[in-house]
């Protein structure tokens, strides 16, 4: 297994610029905040919508739309969330506990790709405008973690625009929420052309102004799938910031005047999966047998993999050999098993 690094590159001139032209390999699949549980989709959504809880750069929990949260002292199956006062959506509507009740219920519905994260929640109650109780089917210490990508949606906006139900992505449905947005986040949606360009502008009424370094007033997000084209766009000045820099291009980008490469450990582990549970492997040339069911075969394959060579040659140093599927900054990691 390999723990990978997240790699990005930014033009020095963009640090003080009012507009940030940002590119990465893939576009958001939808703007519906509960339709897809997927990386690029969440990355864009986090600019527009907000969850109750976020993580800081070290992976620790940080208050967002909830200022504090804890199990009730009277019942460990009831979590109490106190909400941030004075928060408004981009259209000016107030954020309240009713929006939390609505958003959790919406995210638990059939078409939602987020529902598995909320399986333990059996009831959500608005105690008052700024207090919510979530009732679980048993003690659930990882509930805060499951809520860090669960975005809050304005129930009134959803009702007014016919998007109370989550977009049916698998069925090919297109809804108002798939191409429009009304969140509480730092940036507001200006325009959206899927797979072409998305333009955001800073939310002048954002509650987090002064707490977060909002250094640009406009974001122009352009998906560029081809890696070489993406790097060329950065080198030519067409964009200011790219994610997913190919490891083979890191030195060239880093040695270009005016560009900076940033790397950080990524919450991602690449591993070689083995089908050890099947009686027979369908695509091999041995009928009626599964050699991977034999632990000795699996151990032999484990010893045969040259992790250091993969790290140095394939990943160009942008990875770390791992002994378990959880990276060090994820709860559950232990040095003894890694």
Regions found by a protein language model. Name each.
Residues 82, 116-166:
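Surface-exposed binding/hinge segments that line
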Residues 27-42, 65-67, 143-155, 184, ...:
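A structural "hinge/loop" feature
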